[in-house]
């Protein structure tokens, strides 16, 4: 089954995404500014009300470009730690240099926080498994937090070089429109990214995805996941529409 990730910019959008059938969301705030780091209360609320929902959390301290100061980098580190503590299943991050390359030192810093969390979770799980041998208690699998490099990728000056850097950093996927105005317009680049990735990292097409074009984008690129806000504007803000979510899922999965 092809997976749809729904970008949710507020708690009511989480409800709509789940109602429409979504199994994974990207949670952010202020979707009107292309998404900012959400309050930790939103993360906890989503996980408490929908325990089986996979919640990926955007880390973006401000609107504008993706070139961050030292103070902003410090804030992002804190936001990653807070999101992990709040129960995030995935962290969505990205940063660039003024020249339009991946900010490898900052990304290494943020990725190391997630990797340290995952290592600690593995150690805890190992201890539980040892205990299970004595108590006949068999715990479920430990939670591994995944990492997505977000659409800062679409501003990279050398996308194929950036692809290799992001793979080396250990990210699980790249959210991208193929450096075009929409994912549908960027299918040629998306297809080439998918080819070059060779299964080493997922390519997640996003931007302008609708029930009418989602299946075409997937067929043209060979990607196995897709990202959409599935949103409408109500009361001056973007909110997820359950019918649009259901429509995309129907289009990509029949």
Please identify what each model-predicted range represents.
Residues 11-12, 31-53, 71, 97-117, ...:
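Active-site-adjacent beta->alpha loops and helix N-cap segments on the catalytic face
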Residues 56, 60-63, 197-254:
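C-terminal alpha-helical cap/extension of soluble enzyme domains
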Residues 84-120, 138-162, 166:
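Hydrophobic, well-structured mid-protein blocks that either form specific transmembrane helices
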Residues 12-16, 67-79, 157-169, 193, ...:
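Catalytic cores of alpha/beta
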Residues 2-6, 25-27, 55-59, 91-93, ...:
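Hydrophobic faces of well-ordered beta-strands that scaffold small-molecule active sites
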Residues 26-36, 82, 86-98, 171-184, ...:
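Glycine-rich phosphate-binding active-site loops on the catalytic face of alpha/beta enzymes
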Residues 19-28, 50-53, 87-90, 144, ...:
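Glycine-enriched alpha-helix->loop->beta-strand junction motifs that scaffold or abut catalytic
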């Amino acid at each position: 089954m092809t997976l749809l990730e729904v970008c949710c910019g507020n708690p009511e959008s989480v409800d709509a995404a789940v109602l429409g059938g979504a199994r994974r969301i990207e949670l952010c705030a202020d979707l009107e500014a292309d998404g900012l780091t959400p309050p930790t209360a939103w993360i906890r609320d989503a996980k408490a009300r929908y325990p089986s929902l996979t919640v990926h959390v955007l880390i973006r301290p401000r609107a504008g470009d993706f070139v961050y100061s030292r103070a902003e980098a410090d804030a992002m580190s804190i936001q990653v730690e807070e999101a992990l503590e709040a129960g995030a299943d995935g962290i969505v991050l990205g940063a660039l240099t003024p020249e339009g390359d991946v900010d490898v030192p900052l990304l290494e810093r943020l990725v190391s926080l997630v990797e340290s969390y995952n290592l600690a979770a593995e150690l805890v799980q190992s201890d539980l498994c040892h205990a299970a041998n004595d108590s006949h208690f068999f715990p479920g699998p430990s939670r591994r937090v995944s990492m997505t490099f977000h659409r800062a990728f679409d501003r990279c000056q050398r996308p194929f070089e950036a692809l290799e850097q992001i793979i080396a950093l250990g990210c699980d996927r790249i959210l991208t429109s193929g450096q075009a105005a929409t994912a549908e317009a960027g299918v040629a680049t998306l297809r080439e990214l998918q080819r070059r990735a060779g299964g080493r990292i997922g390519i997640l097409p996003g931007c302008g995805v609708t029930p009418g074009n989602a299946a075409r984008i997937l067929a043209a690129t060979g990607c196995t996941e897709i990202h959409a806000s599935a949103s409408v504007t109500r009361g001056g803000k973007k909110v997820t529409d359950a019918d649009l979510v259901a429509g995309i899922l129907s289009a990509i999965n029949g």
